Amino acid sequence: LMKKLIKKNLDIKLKKFQTGKFSPKDFIIADAKDADMGGGVPAPGNIRDQSGKIKKNFKSLENYLHAMEDITKSGLVDIMLMSASNAERLISRGLFKNSPVTPAIRLNDTSDIWGVRHGNYQNNFAKPFRTVNMKNIKKLSDLGLFSITFSRNVEMDISMLNAYRDFRIEAQSHKIRHFLEVFNSPVDIGLDIKAVSYTHLRAHETRI
């Protein structure tokens, strides 16, 4: 007998939203395990002893991958967000085959997430940057995350919005879905960043 394919929780919930037949329990949960895109070696977190005390050493990449596997197998999340390299590893292991969890890939890495050793990128306005090749990403998953950061600086914000516009055009051509993340500016802009970000998104939602 053929094994019945398990539907993705994300697709089920999105269909409910589209038809208006949703309830409070249908909120979407994504586990962000993409810290290696900017955090480097410390990304998996510190090793802890049995009492929970933090040790000096960091967990390994394999520890990080095992954590993603455990959470995915639990079915407690709808989306597992990963870097392209880790997604390639886990998808090749068949982790998401016949799983209710949808794999998603971080599709850009703006300068404000760069956690380079001795770097000071967090002291500067965020600039758009994208590592991934969209054509190759489609072979892994049709879902990804794109992030933007508003700085209340006309040159920086224009470059960020242009990057998002260009990304959307390319993503559409490859039939890749995405969800959007808006970061707070790493630089103090002197007012509530939430108001700035919300106004930007409403003003540009029909143009980008």
Model-assigned labels for residue ranges:
Residues 186-188:
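Domain-level signal for soluble alpha/beta catalytic cores
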Residues 199-208:
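Conserved small/polar residues in nucleotide/adenosyl-binding loops
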Residues 162-173:
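Alpha-helical scaffolding segments of alpha/beta enzyme cores, especially the outer helices
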Residues 177:
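Residue-level detector of anion-binding/catalytic polar loops
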Residues 181:
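Conserved, mostly hydrophobic/aromatic
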Residues 192-196:
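Short low-complexity, flexible loop/linker segments enriched in glycine and/or proline
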Residues 2-153:
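Alpha/beta catalytic barrel-like cores
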Residues 153-161:
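Active-site glycine- and acidic-residue-rich loops that bind
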